[in-house]
A protein has these predicted regions:
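Active-site beta->alpha loop and helix N-cap motifs at the rims of alpha/beta catalytic domains
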Residues: 15-95, 99-104, 122
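Electropositive phosphate-/nucleotide-binding environments in soluble metabolic enzymes
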Residues: 17-20, 28, 39, 63-70, ...
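Alpha-helix-loop-beta-strand connector modules within alpha/beta enzyme cores
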Residues: 7, 39-63, 90-117, 153-180
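Alpha-helical segments flanking ligand/cofactor-binding loops in enzyme cores
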Residues: 24, 43, 70, 74, ...
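Active-site/ligand-binding-proximal alpha/beta "capping" segment
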Residues: 98, 102, 125-165, 221-225
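C-terminal alpha-helical cap/extension of soluble enzyme domains
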Residues: 79-82, 166-254
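Flexible, glycine/proline-enriched loop segments at strand-loop-helix junctions
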Residues: 77-84, 120-124, 144-147, 206-211
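Single conserved hydrophobic/aromatic residue that forms the stacking wall/gate
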Residues: 1-6, 10-11
Length: 254
């Protein structure tokens, strides 16, 4: 049922956000699928993007059994998630899906394992492509509703999309998937590190943040200088008692 609703929405844009401000901006820009973490920003994200489809991450390693995954999944859904992003094993995904929790799974590049594999496309050889595709079919059989396809060749992503019931969410694999996925820090230019080949920086917020930080520092320096030089506080910043009230006070404490 969830897959059918997703297909009818014909959504092409998805982004991962880190703050409620980013979520609000994405929502107002017309992005209808937003992924985020179940952290202290989440309730505000749900508030500022009331009708967006929220895919909320279940951090890898947060749960150690399928039963814990089910419990945590329901907790996140109760908070306002529409689906749970889960990169755990098939057993976890199958258990959650059987309980009716919509799952977004993952195939392809795993960034947090890049120290082992480097940042590279996955599935460029026939053998590796077959492994990725088999993983997709296993996730489909387990009951996942969506699958993020990350940094795989466009030909493989196209074949996967045409041969799975799941909604495919493509990142770094062309325009052949059901949705187009990019991180907000790539779109907004807030990434201080390496920008991958598939990323596109549309604006440069980082440089603006540097300008704002300089303004903050300048403001604090001016405050320090004023205090040292006796220029703050000025008379207009003071609260004073009427002279008769001051005299009355001093008489009372004698």
């Amino acid at each position: 049922t969830w897959c059918l609703v997703g297909s009818e929405m014909c959504i092409r844009d998805r982004t991962h956000i880190d703050t409620a401000k980013e979520a609000e901006a994405a929502y107002k820009a017309g992005i209808e699928i937003i992924s985020c973490e179940p952290d202290h920003h989440f309730k505000d994200v749900r508030k500022v993007a009331p009708t967006a489809f929220l895919s909320v991450g279940l951090k890898h390693g947060l749960v150690s059994s399928p039963q814990e995954a089910i419990k945590k999944g329901f907790e996140i859904m109760e908070m306002g998630a529409d689906a749970i992003y889960c990169s755990h094993s098939i057993n976890f995904i199958e258990a959650m899906a059987k309980e009716g929790i919509p799952i977004t799974a993952h195939v392809g590049l795993v960034p947090n394992l890049s120290t082992w594999t480097n940042f590279r496309a996955v599935g460029k050889t026939a053998e590796e492509a077959l492994k990725v595709y088999q993983n997709v079919k296993d996730l489909e059989s387990a009951g996942a509703a969506c699958v993020e396809v990350e940094v795989v060749p466009v030909e493989l992503a196209d074949y996967i999309t045409k041969n799975t019931r799941m909604i495919t969410m493509g990142m770094g694999c062309g325009d052949v998937c059901d949705t187009q996925y990019l991180f907000c820090n790539d779109i907004l230019g807030t990434n201080k590190g390496h920008y991958p080949r598939h990323a596109k920086k549309y604006v440069d917020i980082l440089s603006k943040e540097d300008e704002l930080q300089k303004i903050r520092i300048d403001g604090f320096k001016m405050f320090v200088d004023d205090v040292k030089n006796g220029q703050y506080p000025e008379d207009k910043h003071l609260i004073k008692m009427e002279e008769k009230e001051l005299d009355n006070f001093l008489n009372k404490i004698k």
